[in-house]
């Protein structure tokens, strides 16, 4: 969707064929980036670390953006991640409620930046999954599973009963709080 900063991409690549290895192993990775160029860059970064395949002797086979199947239904998403802080590397599990996985990932990046001061390059998403309501662990997501949930009415704005009684300028400021 156009509204999200991060998009999910599926990147497929391999090492260049050589005489020793005519058909090199193909690697597929799903990752989040702001655009295709950054997705490719992230793919080669991880492939260099995991499988010793560099971009200079590698080949990009395909790159496609992955879209949400049902972007209008609310789901619980679990995100397993690894991040680098000032003290070292940490593993973490986070839960979010959103309509799309991209929205949940965006929430995760925002929360990690605010709570832990960890920016986008220092975060590695290991795994994501749609979590059923009974398997949710975090209280922040469980609180919305109640079908009889009520939200407080913080303030009430009194509107005129007809357009004829609507005025541009009021004699006194309305009191909105109860």
UniProtKB/Swiss-Prot annotation:
Q: Which GO terms describe its biological process?
A: embryo development ending in seed dormancy; pollen tube growth; translation
Is-annotated flag, keyword Transcription regulation?
no
**What is the protein name for this chain?**
Large ribosomal subunit protein eL20y
Matching InterPro entries = Ribosomal_eL20, Ribosomal_eL20_dom, Ribosomal_eL20_eukaryotes
Entries under SUPFAM superfamilies matching the protein: RplX-like
Q: Which key words tag this protein in UniProt?
A: Ribonucleoprotein, Ribosomal protein
GO-annotated molecular function: mRNA binding; structural constituent of ribosome
Asked if the Swiss-Prot or TrEMBL record annotates the protein with the keyword Ribosomal protein, the reply is yes
The record's listing under Pfam families reads: Ribosomal_L18A
Q: Which domain of life is it from?
A: Eukaryota
Instruction: Name a single GO cellular component.
Output: cytosolic ribosome
Q: Which family does it belong to?
A: Belongs to the eukaryotic ribosomal protein eL20 family.
Q: Taxonomic lineage per UniProt?
A: Eukaryota, Viridiplantae, Streptophyta, Embryophyta, Tracheophyta
């Amino acid at each position: 969707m156009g509204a999200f900063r991060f998009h999910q991409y599926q990147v497929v690549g391999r090492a260049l064929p050589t005489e020793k290895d005519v058909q090199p192993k193909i690697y597929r990775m799903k990752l989040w980036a702001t655009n295709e160029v950054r997705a490719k860059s992230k793919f080669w970064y991880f492939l260099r670390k995991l499988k010793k395949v560099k971009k200079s002797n590698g080949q990009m086979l395909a790159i496609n953006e992955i879209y949400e199947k049902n972007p209008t239904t609310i789901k619980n998403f679990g995100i397993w991640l690894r991040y680098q802080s000032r003290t070292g590397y940490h593993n973490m599990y986070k839960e979010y409620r959103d309509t799309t996985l991209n929205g949940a990932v965006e929430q995760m990046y925002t929360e990690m930046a605010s709570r832990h001061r960890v920016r986008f390059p220092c975060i590695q998403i290991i795994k994501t999954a749609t979590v059923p309501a009974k398997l949710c662990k975090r209280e922040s997501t469980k609180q919305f599973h109640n079908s009889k949930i009520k939200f407080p009415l913080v303030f009430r704005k009194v509107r005129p009963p007809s357009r004829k009684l609507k005025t541009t300028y009021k004699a006194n400021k309305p009191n909105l709080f109860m």
